[in-house]
């Protein structure tokens, strides 16, 4: 299976010459606007899959729900180093910072917005997201739902 030109271009912008074989099908699936779940080992390149597709559709927003702050900071920094317009909202951000970030989002100035799961409990955040042109919502580290989430016993 081959990749479309816009995906190859996005992959190159992220610093990769070609995808791993196991990345191609999920990239093409997401690119077509379909849902996908990728279950793979740490270090296998799951992040590259959604970042490539999100970047290829940079006219729309990709929201990444990431429970681990260290990963948010690392991924945001890496994307910024590759010239990608990205920001994040977590509990360390002031209301003023969040308002500025959401303003950038509404103006279409961000390709990626990383948020922590608790942000989804914010009525104002959900309301702001309802009126945006969102291409993709990614749940990274989804195994943590069962590790840290609400469990009925």
For the regions a language model picked out, list residue spans one by one.
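Conserved motor-coupling elements within RecA-like helicase/translocase cores
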Residues: 99-112
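Short acidic active-site motifs
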Residues: 25, 97-101, 124-125
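Loop/turn-to-beta-strand initiation segments
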Residues: 35, 60-63, 85, 109-113, ...
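SF2 helicase catalytic motif II
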Residues: 111, 121, 125-153
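Conserved pre-motif I regulatory segment
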Residues: 1-41
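Conserved Walker A/P-loop ATP-binding site and its immediately adjacent core
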Residues: 47-48, 56, 60-93, 97, ...
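Walker A/P-loop
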Residues: 32-52, 63-68
